[in-house]
Amino acid sequence: MVRLPRKFKRVLLLVVLLTLVVFVRFKKQYIPTISVFEGSLIDNRDTLSYFNISNLEPSERSEWLPNKRVNAAFVTLARNEDLNDLLKSIRKLEKTFNHKYHYGWVFLNNEEFSDEFKEHVIEAVSGKCEFGLVPQEQWSIPEYIDQDKMHENWKKLQELGILYADKESYRHMCRFESGFFYRHPLVQKYEYYWRVEPSVDFFCDLDFDPFAYMKENNKAYAFTITVTEYSETIPSLWPSTKEFIKMHPNALHPNNALNFISNDDGETYNGCHFWTNFEIAKVDFWESEVYSKYFDYLDKSGNFFYERWGDAPVHSIAVSLFADRDNIHFFNEIGYWHPGSGHCPLDDATRAKCDCDPYESIDYNGWSCLDKFYTAFEMPFPENWSFYSH
């Protein structure tokens, strides 16, 4: 047996080690980062160029993502002063979901976004950013509004202790989110949107794409929190809705969810609505003829200003009456918090991916309508629902 000199062995070992180092560095530099593609639908990775997508600028990443990614984006209405609170929302949503998909983001404002705002959010998001301006006519009091009557009504709401009773900007926001956001050119080009607001939190790591779920299951609208509206803010909303239905009886979907929003077959509104600070929906539902007519009818009443109609009851009534109930979805898996209320999943498999406490969830509060949703949609209650609801 031939024995190699000790010096030769050392040289050979050094060559092997150097080869391994070069190979590892080559893989790290040129093989795609697998986490980017987790949960995505990819037919053939050979069509992808072999480099780390994370090294690209955010605006350049979309062309390297799977071509079966849904045509969707996050949509946020925000002010420049919301920057810090919004960055918290963005970072948490990127961490729990979007770092794997790099969906883009549409930011809308009734004023021009500052350079500081743009620079920070572009740095924070993993997809492309688009910034849009709300047209002035969509953020101003219409000429047909009697402003003396409006201010008199605001005083009455103040006496009742209603939140935002005399806030004009809040009413502009509710009116815009009810009937104009989906008409913005930056939003219209997408099939689905996910609404995100400043100061919200996302508790659970998602191992699936909610946009893809919506598309594959033909869902039109999805929510995480459903609660009861303050009746003092919308006294004429249901009467106006009933008048609209009388004028347009064919507007009602034959498989509607009237039994979710009314306890007496439509005579009155029970106040149940989906909290729209989180919603994932199809853009074309709002673009439909029936919803456009409905919003225009409500808008002409002036009660976005005379009263304090919110976009949440407006959206929820419309979805419950004009959409197929089978196309409405509850994303139980998405743990979510908005100042004042939150949703925390109950099932053990999902909770293992979350950092929230079910005891702090609003779902078992008397204000919640989730129990009504389960009943109206004939869905089974979670296994340990009774434990937390007492």
From Swiss-Prot:
Biological function: Mannosyltransferase involved in O-glycosylation of cell wall and secreted proteins. Plays a major role in extending alpha-1,2-linked mannose in the O-glycan pathway.
Keyword Aminoacyl-tRNA synthetase in annotation: no
PANTHER family xref list: ALPHA-1,2 MANNOSYLTRANSFERASE KTR1
GO biological process: cell wall mannoprotein biosynthetic process; protein N-linked glycosylation; protein O-linked glycosylation; protein O-linked mannosylation
Record-linked Gene3D superfamilies: Spore Coat Polysaccharide Biosynthesis Protein SpsA, Chain A
Family (UniProt): Belongs to the glycosyltransferase 15 family.
Lineage: Eukaryota, Fungi, Dikarya, Ascomycota, Taphrinomycotina
Entry keyword Lipid biosynthesis: no
Main localization category: endoplasmic reticulum
Domain of life: Eukaryota
Enzyme Commission number(s) of this protein: 2.4.1.-
Transmembrane segments: none
Gene source species: Schizosaccharomyces pombe (strain 972 / ATCC 24843) (Fission yeast)
Record's keyword terms, sorted: Endoplasmic reticulum, Glycosyltransferase, Golgi apparatus, Transferase
Matching Pfam families: Glyco_transf_15
Annotated active site: E279 (nucleophile)
UniProt protein name: O-glycoside alpha-1,2-mannosyltransferase omh1
Compartment(s) where it occurs, according to its Swiss-Prot or TrEMBL record: Endoplasmic reticulum; Golgi apparatus
GO terms, molecular function: alpha-1,2-mannosyltransferase activity
One Gene Ontology cellular component: Golgi apparatus
